[in-house]
Amino acid sequence: MSIMNKISFQGENGAYSQSAAQKNFHGEIETISCSTFKQVIEHTEGEKTNYSILPIENSIEGTVGESYDALYSSNLYAVGEIYHKIEHCLIGNGSLEDVDTVYSHPQALGQCRNFLQNYSYKTVPT
């Protein structure tokens, strides 16, 4: 009988880190949503989860400093690496020409910088 792995990740259900966990862990898993990177680490340190999934680096925006800080401040260490493709969507009513301002997470805005600049959209980090 195999033991179900519990994996903590930062974000809501459907987050890229949850998707990475589901894609890369074999067998049945349970994913646990956390509101901060620190909480992700605390879940694994406190044995609520077996593993933590943290975004460490992005090919466009570089390192994710908050993840490094959380990991460095813990007793945990990296045991693997996952490459996970990120694809963003701009969703709304109307056409692209109707859009004036895009509100999103700073990482997402940075990852979509070329697209946003091509359309001259204003951006607001949230």
Residue ranges and their predicted role:
Residues 1-126:
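Domain-level signature for soluble enzymes in the chorismate/prephenate branch of the shikimate pathway
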